[in-house]
Amino acid sequence: MKKILLTAVLCIFTIFIEAQENKFAANRSENAVALITSQLEISDADAEFIQQTLYNKYASNARKIRGKGLSEDEKKAVYRTAAKETRQKLMTKFNREEVQKIIDLERESFKK
């Protein structure tokens, strides 16, 4: 009985921790998509695709970096890899110019 209770408590704690991380990724991706949709004419489906892609990028980066004690160079390597993967994923739906504009607007959203 103690093992079941302990397992349940650990699962709830893990879900709570994961929800906090996802909240950051969700907020950041929502802000970026809001700016992107205000500047570019894209469909709701494309906006949803961009938001999900950016959310996955931010959440993945956080999982790879948080609590790992990585150096600045190692963090930059994680960010570069994620940026390349995101660019490739966006290229499946958008052309090169649109992808560059999306990335520029995403970066601009960090400053707001």
Go through each PLM region and give its residues.
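Charge-rich (acidic/polar
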Residues: 20-112
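Bacterial Sec-dependent N-terminal signal peptides
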Residues: 1-24
